[in-house]
Amino acid sequence: MTETTDSVPEPPSDADQLQPKVSICGLDMPAEVSETAAEAAIGVSEPKKRSALWEFAILAVIAIGLYYVMLTFVARPYLIPSESMEPTLHGCSGCVGDRIMVDKITYRFSSPQPGDVIVFKGPPSWNTMYKSIRSNNIVLRSVQNALSFVGFVPPDENDLVKRVIAVGGQTVQCRSDTGLTVNGKPLKEPYLRPVTMNADLSFSPCLGSEFGPVTVPQGRLWVMGDNRIHSADSRYHCNSTDVVNGLSCTGDPNSGTVPVSNVIGKARVVVWPPSRWGGVGSVNSQQGQ
């Protein structure tokens, strides 16, 4: 009779018993193997993290670049700083004024027209009262200038908003018996609000001193605020030779007019506050002349 014996597994050696083990997915593995696996996992995750950071940096640069292109060539926001364009645009010193979007594309293919509401850089003679918005601290000022370059801080310039009344070659003037005229024809200005100005147009059609006639030089614009009594516009900045006679702006027209090259863009829409959302209309006051 043949005698059979079951195979008996050999007992673990002392070295196996002393070697630390770690359970991974329900399997006991030597600690050395687990450490190697962990190091391999870390080695894979670090390149992924670096890749994600690199992608984020690229996207951030692209976003800033697109924003810069938009501000430079397409459109830019602008804060209305004063009440000179009320009721069309609201603003005042120390309050939350309208924020508008300025279209910078239109005037690359056309010229400003009568009735357009434009944002422009004030000519040198208009900047005597301008106060820089930059810090006196040289370091902070450098940071502001850098942020301004990419559009996160407004440029340090005297940007103004007014309505175009007359363009190059046209003659503008105002008399108490005719009111405001261009080329001798009265204007229709529905954007003027006597209540806003607290004035009676029938009693004071010029809403200030009589002026002109002024023939606007080619390549320049005559601009005025919708809130005439509270607007330092072309009338205010035009040198006068007849002040003693109650007239203004009969001297050098270059002093009161604005170069077309100074125009930043056309006011298109009020984007803030929400209660004021809406378009900024161009009303040609010369229409029908």
UniProtKB/Swiss-Prot annotation:
Any matching Pfam family: Peptidase_S26
GO biological process terms, semicolon-separated: signal peptide processing
Membrane topology, from the record: Single-pass type II membrane protein
Keyword Cell membrane tagged: yes
Extracellular topological intervals: 75-289
Subcellular location: Cell membrane
Topology Cytoplasmic: residue spans: 1-53
InterPro entries: LexA/Signal_pep-like_sf (IPR036286), Pept_S26A_signal_pept_1 (IPR000223), Pept_S26A_signal_pept_1_CS (IPR019758), Pept_S26A_signal_pept_1_Ser-AS (IPR019756), Peptidase_S26 (IPR019533)
Catalytic residue list: 84, 162
PANTHER family: CHLOROPLAST PROCESSING PEPTIDASE, SIGNAL PEPTIDASE I
Designated name of the protein: Probable signal peptidase I
Organism (species): Mycobacterium leprae (strain TN)
